[in-house]
């Protein structure tokens, strides 16, 4: 069985996350976290940074591993590595997706995701309360 490594990023800004709607292919209209395939010689983090630059024209400032999912499709094993990521800017245009949506975790279930991305949504909901900015100590 052929293995394919894929990365995706949960871009967080202003207590919202970015999701993207597929514009082409068998899964047209489904939502996903932006990302793509890892190229030969690339680390997962390098691939994610490259994909965000290519697909969203933004530079990531921070990337932290969140979860790994394995999916089987058409005789292929797809390893999906998901990262929490941050950037100083927001994407201004759709390059490969039909639309980009900023949503709160409370409304993320309103969107039709790929099965593997649904697993990532669950993981995001588990860690979201920990992502609030810590209070400053008086000490």
Go through each PLM region and give its residues.
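Conserved hydrophobic "DFG−1" position in protein kinase catalytic cores
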Residues: 11-12, 19, 85, 102
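Conserved N-terminal beta-strand and adjoining loop/helix that marks the start
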Residues: 1-17, 68
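A short coil-to-beta-strand element that immediately follows conserved catalytic motifs
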Residues: 58-68
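Charged phosphate-binding loop/patch that engages nucleotide di/tri-phosphates or the phosphate backbone
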Residues: 116-139
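Conserved Nudix-box catalytic region and its N-terminal flanking loop in Nudix hydrolases
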Residues: 13-54
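A generic structural signal for short hydrophobic patches within well-formed alpha-helices
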Residues: 38, 108-109, 121
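Active-site-adjacent beta-strand/loop module that shapes the phosphate/pyrophosphate-binding cleft
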Residues: 69-92, 101, 105, 117, ...
């Amino acid at each position: 069985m052929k293995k394919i490594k894929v990365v995706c990023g949960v871009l967080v800004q202003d207590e919202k996350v970015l999701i993207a709607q597929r514009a082409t292919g068998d899964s047209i209209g489904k939502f996903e976290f932006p990302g793509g395939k890892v190229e030969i010689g690339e680390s997962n983090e390098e691939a994610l940074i490259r994909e965000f630059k290519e697909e969203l024209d933004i530079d990531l400032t921070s990337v932290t591993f969140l979860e790994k999912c394995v999916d089987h499709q058409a005789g292929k094993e797809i390893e999906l590595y998901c990262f929490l990521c941050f950037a100083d800017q927001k994407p201004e245009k759709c390059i490969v997706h039909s639309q980009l949506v900023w949503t709160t975790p409370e409304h993320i279930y309103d969107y039709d995701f790929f099965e593997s991305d649904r697993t990532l949504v669950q993981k995001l909901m588990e860690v979201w309360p920990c992502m609030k900015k810590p209070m400053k100590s008086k000490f």
